[in-house]
């Protein structure tokens, strides 16, 4: 039992050089918790509001108003509360905000405080964060979704699909999975370079070559997997994030890079064709965020054999997830803590998904920091999958390195999710 005696918010920079919120929480026993808040590039319309200052400073992206909320109204409301009362503290902040999307105080302000309090309480108890949040049952190391080719909003190239990922399901451990991913990543770099493509990386550490189509990108990845000594569709599978809301307008999916304009039925056919050709086991945001009929059609068509992940569709929001479950839409939720804006609501969304036999994928954002909280959350929730970028950029590797440490701490009790994540 330790009361909150001080909360300090500050403005720091994320991996894109934009301001974000960092919060320190100090407890009366001297324990300190620190958390930094991530930020997305392709954001769903239904996400909680990330409060930005506007004006000329930092081109409008400053977060001094959110910092003022942390140091002022939020501290006034929860200062003196016991840090072990996470749910009560989060609900107090949500009530203080008074809006459905946290647009008053800002989800970035509330989340920073929420996560820092959990870290402070874990420190007070002398427990690692994953153990404090997940209890004794927290032991599953997640299969990484490693984003090795970037397109869409994450890169300056003509590829429509935002992320091409590999999932090393046959690894014997998390550390082994990271090694396999690294080997494929470096093999892919050599293949791209030998074909005359640039090997610059995008926001999430994946390569951003000037490729002509989705299938060309997949072809390079398949070749890299094989040249690294692995078998696609056995050792390593593919996963895609279409971020299709970004190219959906007036009922049409406009794949500019490929010169295709498709209605919902055509988009479903497009995905079914790709899944038939390649070992793709997961597609995120295959349909636009409010194309519920398209999502239902996609789920009915390939949902029995492919993980269909709702990111912009669900935005880590229980109400939208409940709608999706009731409609039989998608079969998985992407979990981004800043989409909903508090630890309590994040954990509630994961619990709802699991109760409905939906999978959950813990995820970073394209604008990240050295904060590795999501690694602990992935293990705490036993969600079995994590999406945290490529094998480049320290803001991405911070999460993989933390998972390696957690696996070491768990010892023989730890279990790598591996092929248990496969459908069908």
Curated annotation (Swiss-Prot):
The reaction(s) this protein catalyses: (2R)-2-phosphoglycerate = phosphoenolpyruvate + H2O
Binding site for Mg(2+): 241, 284, 311
Record: residues binding (2R)-2-phosphoglycerate: 162, 336, 365-366, 387
Example of a GO MF term: phosphopyruvate hydratase activity
Cofactor note: Binds a second Mg(2+) ion via substrate during catalysis.
Cellular component GO terms, alphabetical: cell surface; extracellular region; phosphopyruvate hydratase complex
GO annotation terms (biological process): glycolytic process
Residues the record marks as active site: 204 (proton donor), 336 (proton acceptor)
CDD domains associated with the record: enolase
EC number, UniProt record: 4.2.1.11
Pfam families for the chain: Enolase_C, Enolase_N
InterPro entries referenced in this protein's UniProt entry, alphabetically: Enolase (IPR000941), Enolase-like_C_sf (IPR036849), Enolase-like_N (IPR029017), Enolase_C (IPR020810), Enolase_CS (IPR020809), Enolase_N (IPR020811)
Keywords from the UniProt entry: Cytoplasm, Glycolysis, Lyase, Magnesium, Metal-binding, Secreted
Pathway stated in the Swiss-Prot or TrEMBL entry: Carbohydrate degradation; glycolysis; pyruvate from D-glyceraldehyde 3-phosphate: step 4/5
Family classification: Belongs to the enolase family.
Family annotation (NCBIfam families): eno
Functional summary from the UniProt entry: Catalyzes the reversible conversion of 2-phosphoglycerate (2-PG) into phosphoenolpyruvate (PEP). It is essential for the degradation of carbohydrates via glycolysis.
HAMAP family cross-referenced by the UniProt entry: Enolase (MF_00318)
Protein name: Enolase
Organism: Parvibaculum lavamentivorans (strain DS-1 / DSM 13023 / NCIMB 13966)
Organism classification: Bacteria, Pseudomonadati, Pseudomonadota, Alphaproteobacteria, Hyphomicrobiales
């Amino acid at each position: 039992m330790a009361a909150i005696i001080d909360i300090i918010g500050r403005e720091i920079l994320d991996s894109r050089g934009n301001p974000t919120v960092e919060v320190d929480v100090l407890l009366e026993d001297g324990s300190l918790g620190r958390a930094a808040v991530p930020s997305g590039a392709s954001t769903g319309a239904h996400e909680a509001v990330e409060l930005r200052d506007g004006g000329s400073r930092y081109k409008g992206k400053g977060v001094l108003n959110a910092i003022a909320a942390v140091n002022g109204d939020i501290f006034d409301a929860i200062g003196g509360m016991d840090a072990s009362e996470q749910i009560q503290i989060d609900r107090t902040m949500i009530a203080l905000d008074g809006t459905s999307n946290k647009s008053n105080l800002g989800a970035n302000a509330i989340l920073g405080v929420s996560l820092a309090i959990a870290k402070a309480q874990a420190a007070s108890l002398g427990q690692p964060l994953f153990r404090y949040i997940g209890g004794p049952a927290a032991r599953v190391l997640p299969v990484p979704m490693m984003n090795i080719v970037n397109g869409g909003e994450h890169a300056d190239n003509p590829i429509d699909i935002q992320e091409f990922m590999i999932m090393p399901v046959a690894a014997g451990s998390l550390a082994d999975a990271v090694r396999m991913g690294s080997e494929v990543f470096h093999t892919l770099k050599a293949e791209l370079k030998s074909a005359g493509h640039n090997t610059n990386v995008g926001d999430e550490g994946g390569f951003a070559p000037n490729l002509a189509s989705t299938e060309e990108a997949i072809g390079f990845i398949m070749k890299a997997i094989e040249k690294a000594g692995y078998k696609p569709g056995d050792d390593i599978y593919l996963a895609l994030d279409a971020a299709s809301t970004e190219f959906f307008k007036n009922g049409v999916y406009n794949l500019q890079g490929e010169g295709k304009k498709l209605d919902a039925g055509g988009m479903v056919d497009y995905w079914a064709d790709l899944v038939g050709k390649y070992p793709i086991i997961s597609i995120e945001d295959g349909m636009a965020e409010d194309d519920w009929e398209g999502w239902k059609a996609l789920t009915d068509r390939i949902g029995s054999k492919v993980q269909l992940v709702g990111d912009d569709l669900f935005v880590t929001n229980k109400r939208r997830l409940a709608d999706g479950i009731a409609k039989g839409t998608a079969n998985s939720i992407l979990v981004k803590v800043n989409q909903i804006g508090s630890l309590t609501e994040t954990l509630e969304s994961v619990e709802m998904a699991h109760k409905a036999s939906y999978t959950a994928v813990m995820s970073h954002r394209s604008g990240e920091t050295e904060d590795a909280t999501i690694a602990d959350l992935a293990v705490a929730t036993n969600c079995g999958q994590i999406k945290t970028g490529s094998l480049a950029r320290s803001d991405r590797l911070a999460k993989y390195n933390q998972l390696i440490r957690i696996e070491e701490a768990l010892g023989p009790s730890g279990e790598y999710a591996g092929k248990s994540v496969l459908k069908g």
